[in-house]
Amino acid sequence: AELDLPISLHEEDPEFIIRPGVNQGKVAEQLEYGGASATAEDVMVARDCILALHTGASVCIQHISSGNSVEIVRTAKKLGADVHAEATPHHFTLTEDAVLKYGTNARMNPPLRTEEDRIKIIEGIKDGTIDMIVTDHAPHSDEEKARPLENAPSGIRGLETSLALGIKSLVEPGHISLMKLMELMSKNPAEFYRMIPGSITKGAAADLVIFGEKELWTVRKEDFASKASNSPFIGWELPGKIYYTISSGKIVYQR
């Protein structure tokens, strides 16, 4: 708090993790994997929310995955703590069942959890408990992800699919408006990290994404910007086709 700097925290206590990347639940039991319990996240979130409350520090709970952790953050905010929280598109779109379908491309830290957790994350987004949507972009090679589940690295790529999944999972079902999604993905993260949020005004630097909200596109491995293709969303048809990405006035992506 004395330094007036934001603190971002990945919340997992290894003491409550048998094996990372998969939720400790029905899928881990089926695979005899062990898994990472929601308790591993919940105890760390509770600790850091209490510390934020007592110190006045500005804290961000990164890529929240547990419904109980959402409730802990909600309570901390009501008590006056300067606590913020992120959610990723994969955590509000998929559940632990994705591991059975997508294998290592659904292994991540913190892991995908239950449908109840997914719904609680969406509720947290709707009521403002979760105020940022981020990618937790973690590219890995095909060779790395081809390893057995227990030996493969955790994480998926998220840059190309984040906007589309936000539209599909949050806007189209009516949970939030498109403008609210833009705020969660751009304005709020910029403000938390003491950056100047972009604005569409005369003379301002053009930092823009031009897209068709309802235009469909198919996620294809060959369209990813890097060599990594570790995504469970390959083959999905999604809304929000992007035509241009403009950074500091320069076109850096064009379909």
Regions found by a protein language model. Give the residues of each.
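Histidine/acidic residue-rich metal-binding segments in metalloenzymes
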Residues: A1-I133
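Generic alpha-helical hydrophobic packing signal
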Residues: L79-A81, I167, Y244
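Residue-level signal for pocket-adjacent positions within structured domains
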Residues: A28-L31, A87, G103, R107, ...
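His/Asp/Glu-enriched, well-ordered alpha-helical/loop segment
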Residues: E29-S58, N105, G124-I133, A138-F211
